[in-house]
């Protein structure tokens, strides 16, 4: 199924862990909107979502890294390998060693926490080892000066993605 959370409570009319329910039970639930209001929509399988999105949008599969071998099989089956973004905060050498076979077939976007003391080294590793088209950064406070350093380090090499869904990811700012 396509589910962001490990629990059903926030995004569906169900309760409890996703892993504790059958596919039939989950398919019977309804999705909730951002205000937690029940909608008419059902929980799709990943395959259904890929087919629906095919040719329309890119999909950010930010929770799929640990299952990417399985996910990739679906991407090939649905012809959507060029429509997804695979993300991870794993070290660049680990990504290259374990997922290198996918890096020319899908967009890979590393995630780097700029509050980490090794952030710039991690960025350099990614730029040297993987050469991503973009990098997602997060940082907790505007007092962090690394967003300025990142801009210079990445100029002409890769795009910058700041996730502004929560203020804890973008220096206290959100959408």
Where are these regions (language model features)?
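Hydrophobic faces of well-ordered beta-strands that scaffold small-molecule active sites
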Residues: 59-61, 84-87, 104-111, 135-137, ...
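Structural recognition of alpha->loop->beta junctions
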Residues: 78-86, 101-106, 125-134, 174-175
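An active-site metal/cofactor-coordinating segment within enzyme catalytic domains
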Residues: 1-55
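Acidic, His- and aromatic-enriched active-site or binding-groove loops in soluble protein domains
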Residues: 13-16, 80-91
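Active-site beta-loop-alpha junctions enriched in small/polar residues
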Residues: 5-6, 29-31, 64-66, 89-91, ...
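Active-site-adjacent beta->alpha loops and helix N-cap segments on the catalytic face
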Residues: 67-69, 90-97, 142-153
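C-terminal active-site rim and adjoining tail of enzyme catalytic domains
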Residues: 117-175
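Distinct, well-ordered alpha-helical segments
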Residues: 67-78, 92-103, 116-127
